[in-house]
Amino acid sequence: MEQEVRKKQMKKQQTLVLIKPDGLVKALTGNIITELSDTRLIIAGAKIVQVTRELAEEHYQHLREEKFFDELIKYIMGEFHVKRVLALVYHGDDAIKKVRGVVGSTNPEKAEHTTIRGKYGRITSEGVFENVVHASENEKEAEREIKLWFRPEELATTIYPTESKEVKKLEYFWKK
């Protein structure tokens, strides 16, 4: 009975996870995915992305006024490591909370040592957080980020409403 009530309180969510260039160059992809799999969430989408300046700036638009913005853009674009990111969408009960718990604090020095960022992240001598992964902070951010990084047909499950439009071929677009 208690388990049924708890299950009803859980909310199906999706969240974006990026394994950043420093995570890829350090060959941490397998370790990170293994740790994320402990959440028992479903991978709804996965792809390797070469991050453009436009994508990076749109992703980090909320940090545009920060003094570290330019370094952050260079970092996610792979100018310090490799020029690619592994983008993943996880789906399931309380996905955001579960993933954020495994990932840890944005600042690797403040992250619990058992979390991904606590184990593998660092702060460079220039003050750049090489925190290995990104994870959406809340539902609104998750939706915005997933729609930014993935087209509907790239996801194995429909998580947001879409509509089809006739272009050169049948394509799907996120509903506004």
Which residues does each PLM region occupy?
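Non-catalytic terminal and connector segments of soluble metabolic enzymes
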Residues: 2-176
